Amino acid sequence: MAVTKLVLVRHGESQWNKENRFTGWYDVDLSEKGVSEAKAAGKLLKEEGYSFDFAYTSVLKRAIHTLWNVLDELDQAWLPVEKSWKLNERHYGALQGLNKAETAEKYGDEQVKQWRRGFAVTPPELTKDDERYPGHDPRYAKLSEKELPLTESLALTIDRVIPYWNETILPRMKSGERVIIAAHGNSLRALVKYLDNMSEEEILELNIPTGVPLVYEFDENFKPLKRYYLGNADEIAAKAAAVANQGKAK
């Protein structure tokens, strides 16, 4: 049976991950640790014999720079790349820039967990005159006002990620090309929920660690057979637990 593989990588630790702040569409770069995580992901993929024909990422530099570092370690810096806002992190609305633990102290752990992980729960909206509104950013100049979020739930993130998967990424895989996607915790959770047909309760508890390759294997009909992380299982579990704990009051 022919097996097709897809590799997903959540960007390495960003400066705002390090500071435990809600990031969303804010364009913050990788921390030094994040660069190291991205390079380590590339080295691991190389050791495991992976190479690719095409790459996808978001229009946010923490994902773009993660992909650069991964491809550099693979000696595939030349690889064609498509960047799309549809792979951006979920938009966190008026929470963007706020410290997660301080927000939990103010509103309670459960409210922040729902804002972070609730399927249809949206954080408080931005206003259009807020400097954080994406309509002020030239990279989104071609988007309609309807496409520009003031906030997003995971459900709304799915509404943009999955059509992009079905219309753009999957056809390329079906043509025989080997694909890697470097994106974000919630855009990747959106894809995992769809591919694995997860319930809203199951996806609530899924935390994707930074800078760890996540491999999907598909059958000849492009139905997922299994998914697994590359690397040390204990280290990966610890990183995922750390992601889960970010939204708790100290």
From Swiss-Prot:
UniProt catalytic activity: (2R)-2-phosphoglycerate = (2R)-3-phosphoglycerate
Binding site for substrate: 10-17, 23-24, 62, 89-92, 100, 116-117, 185-186
SUPFAM superfamilies: Phosphoglycerate mutase-like
Active site: 11 (tele-phosphohistidine intermediate), 89 (proton donor/acceptor)
Keyword Secreted attributed: no
EC number: 5.4.2.11
Keyword annotations: Acetylation, Gluconeogenesis, Glycolysis, Isomerase
Cellular component terms per the entry's GO annotation: cytoplasm; cytosol
Region forming the signal peptide: none
MF term (GO), any: protein homodimerization activity
Regulation of catalytic or functional activity: Strongly inhibited by vanadate.
Entries under PANTHER family matching the protein: PHOSPHOGLYCERATE MUTASE
Assembly, per entry: Homodimer.
Physiological role: Catalyzes the interconversion of 2-phosphoglycerate and 3-phosphoglycerate.
Protein name, entry field: 2,3-bisphosphoglycerate-dependent phosphoglycerate mutase
Organism: Escherichia coli (strain K12)
Gene name as annotated: gpmA
